[in-house]
């Protein structure tokens, strides 16, 4: 499973002119299920995202996670957006291949599972809409952008 995290001051997702998800300070999480992925990869990816220390402490060092933005337990938001294009392979020419992405039914199941688990573990989770044409608006903070990959079990 792949994700790209962007530390944001704020972000929102718009579908057909309607805002469907919005957060203040936190993480925009673009997530993609790949062929061979299961709930195990989703769990590992989510655990990594929630504990990753990419927010600044009082000394300006990246020492805080989205679960503890201020050192006092204040949580930032998670805006989770499905993006199968993270599985793109552009090595063979000028048109990327997406054969590495999970089939749509599996992708939806794993995305829904990831979101459900995130909501169990984190107090503020917003989402886009799976397979929708979305406009993602964000104010990148830093900028800080982190790619993550949890490979399927061998």
From Swiss-Prot:
It comes from the Bacteria. One of its GO terms (biological process) is D-amino acid catabolic process. Pfam families: Tyr_Deacylase. It catalyses: glycyl-tRNA(Ala) + H2O = tRNA(Ala) + glycine + H(+); a D-aminoacyl-tRNA + H2O = a tRNA + a D-alpha-amino acid + H(+). It is found in: Cytoplasm. One of its GO terms (molecular function) is D-tyrosyl-tRNA(Tyr) deacylase activity. Keywords: Cytoplasm, Hydrolase, RNA-binding, tRNA-binding. Gene3D superfamilies: D-tyrosyl-tRNA(Tyr) deacylase. Signal peptide: none annotated. GO terms for cellular component: cytoplasm. A motif (Gly-cisPro motif, important for rejection of L-amino acids) lies at residues 142-143. Its EC number is 3.1.1.96. Belongs to the DTD family. A Gly-cisPro motif from one monomer fits into the active site of the other monomer to allow specific chiral rejection of L-amino acids. Homodimer. An aminoacyl-tRNA editing enzyme that deacylates mischarged D-aminoacyl-tRNAs. Also deacylates mischarged glycyl-tRNA(Ala), protecting cells against glycine mischarging by AlaRS. Acts via tRNA-based rather than protein-based catalysis; rejects L-amino acids rather than detecting D-amino acids in the active site. By recycling D-aminoacyl-tRNA to D-amino acids and free tRNA molecules, this enzyme counteracts the toxicity associated with the formation of D-aminoacyl-tRNA entities in vivo and helps enforce protein L-homochirality. This is D-aminoacyl-tRNA deacylase. It comes from Polaromonas naphthalenivorans (strain CJ2). The lineage of its organism: Bacteria, Pseudomonadati, Pseudomonadota, Betaproteobacteria, Burkholderiales. The gene is dtd.
